[in-house]
A protein has these predicted regions:
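Generic secondary-structure boundary signal with a strong preference for alpha-helix termini
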Residues: 26-29, 59, 88, 120, ...
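Alpha-helix boundary/capping residues
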Residues: 35, 90, 132-135
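Short, surface-exposed, polar/charged, turn-prone segments marking secondary-structure boundaries
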Residues: 38, 72-75, 101-103, 121-127, ...
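Gly/Ser/Thr-enriched, mixed-charge loops and adjacent short helices
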Residues: 107-189
């Protein structure tokens, strides 16, 4: 049964499905473990968007990562670009728990190698799928941020990219609300 679910949720460039149906905590655990085995690094960046099922997904996915003794840099509730930016800056692999533009009952994952190199169908995603398609003991624990949390440091980094003094003219700007993480706007401004 898991194999059929994996066939349904592994897409060309990400993993997504209806939460509680085609993707659930057991599958998230297996994918977390498989991703941690696939990447050579000992530390993985993890963030999530604002979906209701993300806490359950976070618990399961990070439990899978920790099952092989890898560390997590938790960035919290962020847009997808934050995980990719930190992956590039820190040269660490990353994962964002999100189903992107899909309806609210969906959830999934976008994965990248160190340096923000996306993992897709032809660059390791099918290898991760094979690793996830094994019978493993599943031990899901409530995620506790005992590892590193870089959310605040990242927002400070963004705020320091441009100093208010360097802007000498009236500034017009736009806000992209398309990624669904309104809290980030509040933290940055």
């Amino acid at each position: 049964m898991t194999k059929n679910k994996l066939d349904l949720i592994f897409k060309s460039y990400d993993i997504r499905g209806v939460y509680g149906d085609s993707i659930d905590q057991d599958i998230a655990y297996k994918i977390g473990k498989a991703f941690a085995e696939f990447v050579p690094d000992d530390t993985i960046i993890v963030g999530h968007d604002g979906r209701v099922s993300n806490i359950e997904m976070l618990d399961a996915f990070t439990s899978g990562i920790k099952s092989i003794n890898k560390e997590i840099i938790y960035v919290g509730l962020v847009p997808t670009d934050t995980v990719y930016s930190l992956s590039g800056l820190l040269k660490k692999p990353g994962a964002i728990i999100t189903a992107s533009h899909n309806p609210k009952n969906y959830n999934g994952l976008k994965l990248c190698n160190a340096g923000a190199i996306p993992i897709g169908e032809n660059s390791g995603l099918m290898d991760i799928k094979k690793l996830a398609d094994r019978n493993v003991e599943i031990r899901i624990e409530k995620f506790q941020n005992n590892d590193k949390y870089l959310g605040n440091e990242y927002y400070e980094h963004l705020k320091n990219l441009v100093s208010p003094e360097s802007i000498s003219q009236k500034l017009n700007f736009g806000i992209d609300g398309g990624n669904g993480v309104y809290l980030v706007r509040y933290l940055i401004l």
